[in-house]
Amino acid sequence: MSYGYGGYGNCGGGILGSVLGMAGGMAGGYGGYGGYGGYGRCGADNVFYRWRCCDYSPYECCIQLETWVVVFLVIFIIGFFVCLCACLAGCVWSARNRE
């Protein structure tokens, strides 16, 4: 986590932080205006993602997915499309055999 008052290397809110921070009030939540609680601090990390300073702005926080989450999503999406293609091929094969 980064702590500070807007100096270089301290993260602020970012777009997602602003959305998540709406429930925390004007300067609260997971970013909002100036970071967690408005003091240039990123939100808490968890098992699925971690907060990092954005490449384009050292004052904003960005979510970085954990490597295992990205690998799982890629495998899941590939598996979904393979199953979809297999189901479509089965439907086509079944329809051709009926004729």
UniProtKB/Swiss-Prot annotation:
Protein name in UniProt: Uncharacterized protein ZK353.2
Domain of life of the source: Eukaryota
InterPro entries cross-referenced by the UniProt entry: SUP-1-like (IPR022559)
Pfam hit, one: DUF2650
